[in-house]
Amino acid sequence: MTENRIPLAGVIGCPIAHSKSPQLHRHWLKTYGVDGHYMPMHVEPEDLESVVRMMPRMGFVGANVTIPHKQSIMEIADKVTDRAKLMGAANTLIFHEDGAIVADNTDGYGFITNLHEGAPDWDAKSGPATVFGAGGASRAVIASLIEAGVPEIRLTNRTRSRAKEVAQTFGSKVTAVDWVEAGNVIEDASLVVNTTSLGMTGQRRLRVPLDGLHSGIVVTDLVYNPLKTELLQAAEEAGCTVVDGLGMLLHQAVPGFERWFGQRPEVNSAARDAIL
């Protein structure tokens, strides 16, 4: 890319109309007076490789990747970071000047940064964490919790085989628990995390007994529509510290924006308002 070319970035998905990323990145571009563009791109799975290969030649410096391309993009990239390999998905692309494509994953960074911001008194080493769900988001959460020093993680999923598979990936600190037992691994947890879509507007409810919630537990939900899910409402009523999922979306975008546009953006109330 020549020095006088305006840097381009965007988000690739199918569909893409739901993505909040354009609103957020355009807010930051305007806030910091950065000369750059960020655009949503609807890309069908069969066109993914040809589009991504063409992007560096068109002046793109990188892109975010969302459903359904977060796994398949790893097969296309020239290099995949270790954390993206561990999480089994990539959400951020960096295009080098020679055209090389690097796939990374910033979801774990976004999760743990949001958690520390929303629950500054939470101590990773204070006790076990209970995690609902065994999809890509779950892997990012687990990786970041292990790195933070959480001693034990109880992973529960509606399909037990998926929970066992993820647990085996991460080793002895992660134990798979039957979904019907989910309510029994809450009371002595220091942290409870929902990584499923259950509780999201238009999705089924998270039907897990929550009577084990009490003050001293931090509860966070990756769902941010609605912003206060039934899980967070119940946790708040039980005296827990609650952290909504919007901050993860904001924080995971920071590393990519900084890399592409040379400005580290701040996650603040204005950024939250930009995507609500």
UniProtKB/Swiss-Prot annotation:
Q: Where does shikimate bind?
A: S19, K20, S21, T66, N91, D107, Y224
The Gene Ontology CC terms held by the record are: cytosol
The GO molecular function terms of this record are:
NADP binding; shikimate 3-dehydrogenase (NADP+) activity
Its EC number(s) = 1.1.1.25
Recorded metabolic or biological pathway in which this protein acts: Metabolic intermediate biosynthesis; chorismate biosynthesis; chorismate from D-erythrose 4-phosphate and phosphoenolpyruvate: step 4/7
Membrane-crossing ranges are none
Record-annotated active site? K70
Q: What reaction does this enzyme carry out catalytically?
A: shikimate + NADP(+) = 3-dehydroshikimate + NADPH + H(+)
Q: Per its UniProt record, what SUPFAM superfamilies does this chain match?
A: Aminoacid dehydrogenase-like, N-terminal domain, NAD(P)-binding Rossmann-fold domains
Q: Which residues bind NADP(+)?
A: D82, G133, A134, G135, G136, A137, N157, R158, T159, R160, S161, R162, L222, G245
Q: Which GO terms describe its biological process?
A: amino acid biosynthetic process; aromatic amino acid family biosynthetic process; chorismate biosynthetic process; shikimate metabolic process
Which keywords describe this protein according to UniProt? Amino-acid biosynthesis, Aromatic amino acid biosynthesis, NADP, Oxidoreductase
The UniProt entry's sequence similarity note says: Belongs to the shikimate dehydrogenase family.
NCBIfam families to which the protein is assigned, alphabetical = aroE, PRK00258.1-4
Known partners and oligomeric status = Homodimer.
What does this gene product do? Involved in the biosynthesis of the chorismate, which leads to the biosynthesis of aromatic amino acids. Catalyzes the reversible NADPH linked reduction of 3-dehydroshikimate (DHSA) to yield shikimate (SA).
Q: Which PANTHER family match?
A: BIFUNCTIONAL 3-DEHYDROQUINATE DEHYDRATASE_SHIKIMATE DEHYDROGENASE, CHLOROPLASTIC, SHIKIMATE DEHYDROGENASE
| Protein name as it appears in the record | Shikimate dehydrogenase (NADP(+))
Identify the coding gene. Answer: aroE
